[in-house]
């Protein structure tokens, strides 16, 4: 399945458009306890969200496990999800990884949309179709490759992040800059992390995602 990445300027209209292309009888939103508080209020104001079922799991990567996965399956089941339902994964890489795996396995697969809320998830985790959970003390030990229908990147969510989370994503962008153009690298190293310009960062995120997409195209299953 081809994944479409949208650099958002009008999140509500872009989400409405994406949902119109995702067959769904019911809509679900997966958050963790952090994004439920910091990010979900933005979506709750959208008309297209008025009947959405919200499923919330504990935050942090330590909860990217079978217990949280079962919580999502249970939430989908109790909410009456069918094979024709759709789930939005709203959060960082933990949410997009686990949510993608849950959606890919529930009813043998339902549509899902990723709306990453961390810089690292925007330029890496949410793009490329890798989904999964930690198991037996090992990271990402169980999972599948399955693309979300859409990835919607809205850099406004980055206002909710602390410096450590911004730096984590920026480090991944630097890796992309090293294997891309000199111009991209120079813009990255001169970017002011202390006073980030969100419009400039939005463009840089788009450039970084293009590098990630080229990597995935060359080796989609990390052979």
Stretches with model-predicted labels:
Residues 101-196:
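A glycine/threonine-rich phosphate-anchoring loop and its flanking beta-alpha core
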Residues 1-86, 175, 199:
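ATP/NTP phosphate-donor binding region
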Residues 96:
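Catalytic nucleophile loop
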Residues 70-73, 171, 175, 185-189, ...:
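Predominant activation on well-ordered alpha-helical scaffold segments within soluble catalytic domains
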